UniProtKB/Swiss-Prot annotation:
Transmembrane portions of the chain: none
Signal peptide: none
EC number: 1.14.11.64
Protein name: Glutarate 2-hydroxylase
Origin species: Pseudomonas putida (strain ATCC 700007 / DSM 6899 / JCM 31910 / BCRC 17059 / LMG 24140 / F1)
Catalytic activity: glutarate + 2-oxoglutarate + O2 = (S)-2-hydroxyglutarate + succinate + CO2
């Protein structure tokens, strides 16, 4: 099967064949494509960008685009069109990316560089207030006393969109697994809006476009509340979402009851997909029509998982493309 055949509206011409990596539909969903980079491609990239530590990417933001260019050149110019077309394609919009040979925590800096290169072939990653950088690294362990579900291992992190409590355009989310030990469970959970059984009913409800207040706990280091609706549309009138159950603050009974019903519908959807992500692999999804979450872990005293996220905007003038925000 040619994974390209699902993309209806191209924003750039697609290559006849990928070079330096392969593409295939994932086992979990035909909407989620798997990109696997050959070891030779990965090794060549690591060597080519060795002169720049991650700190250089933090200080000089243009270098993030330069290392993206290097990765695309190693793939003979075939990578950027695939990433852009996929992230903007409503029928897909999601990728599980695996760079062969980057699979140990000792290679964490190279993992950050590789993910940064991919992200900056489609756009730019936003400032993350939690870390003070364009990315955030954090650890999940067996016990947790933080102020959100992000690091709590023994419960499901419900489906949500990122960027709900900041005034930043958040078109994409990238989630990398850097390390894990003594892990059982904890798969990524994904739901595409067009697969959600009750999407139309909630999208048509009067509450869908009501402006609501969104706040963040202290750990997010965001002081100001933001106001926006749960639903919006793209230019073709299709639903997009900006939603997270933890940070929305209903003003009254009616809003609270509707939000609770929305949450129960999302969590009860039979169309959720559970995706295992290996160390060094990462998900790159369109944040406006994919929701993501995390399944619970099996308790273990030595449990440890280190993750990195980037989230940002797509920087490409696709005709009729609207961010829905």
């Amino acid at each position: 099967m040619n994974a390209f055949t699902q993309i209806d509206e191209l924003v750039m011409p697609l290559p006849l064949e990928p070079q330096g990596y392969t593409i295939a539909p994932s086992k979990q969903s035909p909407r989620l494509l798997e990109l696997t980079f050959a070891r030779e491609t990965v090794e060549a990239f690591v060597q080519a960008v060795a002169q720049w530590p991650v700190q250089a990417l933090e200080y000089k933001s243009f270098l993030r685009f330069r290392i993206g260019e290097i990765l695309d050149e190693l793939c003979q110019g075939t990578l950027r069109p695939v990433l852009l077309n996929t992230i903007l394609d409503r029928a897909t919009g999601g990728m599980l990316i695996t760079p062969i040979g980057l699979d140990d925590v000792s290679q964490a800096e190279d993992m950050v560089k590789f993910t940064t290169a991919c992200a900056h072939l489609i756009g730019r990653s936003n400032y993350d207030a939690m870390s003070g950088q364009f990315y955030a690294r954090f650890v999940v362990v067996n016990s947790d006393n933080s102020d959100s579900y992000l690091r709590q291992p023994h419960r499901v992190m419900e489906l949500h969109n990122d960027g709900t409590f900041v005034n930043q355009i958040t078109d994409y989310v990238l989630m990398l697994k850097i390390d894990e030990k003594n892990m059982e469970g904890g798969n990524s959970l994904l739901l595409h809006l067009d697969d959600w059984e009750q999407c139309e009913a909630f999208f048509r409800h009067p509450m869908a476009r009501r402006e609501m207040r969104w706040t963040a706990p202290p750990s997010k280091k965001v002081a100001e509340d933001v106001f926006h609706s749960v639903f919006d549309t793209d230019t073709e009138g299709r639903p997009t979402m900006r939603y997270i159950d933890q940070f929305v603050q209903p003003e009254n009974y009616e809003e609270g009851i509707w939000l609770n019903a929305l949450s129960e519908s999302l969590e009860g959807s039979s169309k959720k997909v559970s995706v295992p992500v290996g160390v060094g692999s990462f998900l790159l999804i369109n944040n406006l029509f994919w929701l993501h979450g995390r399944d619970r872990f099996t308790p273990h005293e030595g449990l440890r998982r280190e993750l990195m996220r980037q989230r940002g905007y797509v920087a490409f003038p696709k005709p009729l493309y609207q961010r829905g925000q």
